[in-house]
Amino acid sequence: MWIYILLAIVIIVLICVATYFYIDWRMNKEIEQEHKERDTVEKRLTTSLKTLCVQLGIDLSYHKELGDAAGRILYHSMNGRLFVDDARIEILEKYKDEPYTLAHELGHYMAIKQRQDSSEEGADTEADKLCRLILNDNEQKLLAISLRCYFHQMEVVK
């Protein structure tokens, strides 16, 4: 009698362990697939942003060091007015294939060009708009957390 109870317990434990490993394997496979999809979308976004720089005539360069900045846009200022006609964007080499820093700097370009706004908030707003114009709905869902984090669109907790 005890042997049957013990055997039943062992079988139940083995089934639970096998189920756990199957679920873990399947989740890892899904996560890996999602990472591949996200990487593909980020590469496409980066390529689109670089193409936009070329179309707008913005010189884009990569550097090993930029002080404490991940990227920056260089533009002219005269009598309190900002000019981005000959703007240059500089990005750290380690962010060369990552879209968010480039999008932020292009956001500065757009905010200055449209509203004479050189603020970080203005750049983030424009960068978010720009990325959402480039990405389709599914791609936006895939990068939703990244877009919110990089462009400071987080809800304020009270």
Language-model features: locations:
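Catalytic Zn2+-binding segment of zinc metalloproteases
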Residues: L106-G122, L133-L135
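Non-transmembrane interaction and regulatory regions of membrane-associated proteins
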Residues: D117, E121, T125, K129, ...
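Feature marks short, highly hydrophobic, charge-poor N-terminal signal-anchor/signal peptide-like helices
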Residues: M1-I11
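Active-site scaffold of zinc-dependent metalloenzymes
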Residues: I58-K96, L106-Y109
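Transmembrane-cytosolic junction motif
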Residues: I15-K43
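Long, well-structured alpha-helical subdomains associated
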Residues: K94, I134-K158
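Zn2+-dependent metallopeptidase catalytic core
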Residues: R38-G57
